[in-house]
Amino acid sequence: MVKEKTNKVERLPITNDYIFKRVFAFEGNESVLKDFLEAILKKDIEEVEIKNPEIIPYEKDEKRGLLDIKAQIDDGTILDIEMQMEDEKNTEERGTEYLGKMISEQLQEGEEYIKLKKSIVIFITNYNFLKRNSYHSVGKVKFDETLPEEYVNMGYKEEDEIASKYIEFHYIELPKY
């Protein structure tokens, strides 16, 4: 009896860390990342450049950062795209840390603040993180209602006024899709 040898190919999902980076951050696949970012950010993008994902600490005892995918688009916006399979109960903290480091590494001593570029963190999670029903949520820094009501009624506060146009979070929760 002759035994037939079969080659089984294991199919890995796009949520696998290796596959995710291979598809979106591999040299030559910039168009795939561009299309993905256009869909998420709802804007036309001319060019996307994949950057070194390592965030090098300034101090020896500072936490090192290694982003899944770091990219920059043609308007200068810097992006971190993270695939999170397990809820380690630190999504908000991790995103804030990564965003802060992406901002702090932009300017060198003596550079003008006007050179600061928008930074966006995109989390794709395999778990529910937010209480909202939407699978895609966008977080921006907005002003709270702090003015006395009479000033608000006189037009001194614009509804949903953005406190900083340089900071943005996107959460894509796969179980809600």
Model segments located where?
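Elongated, amphipathic alpha-helical interaction scaffolds
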Residues: M1-Y177
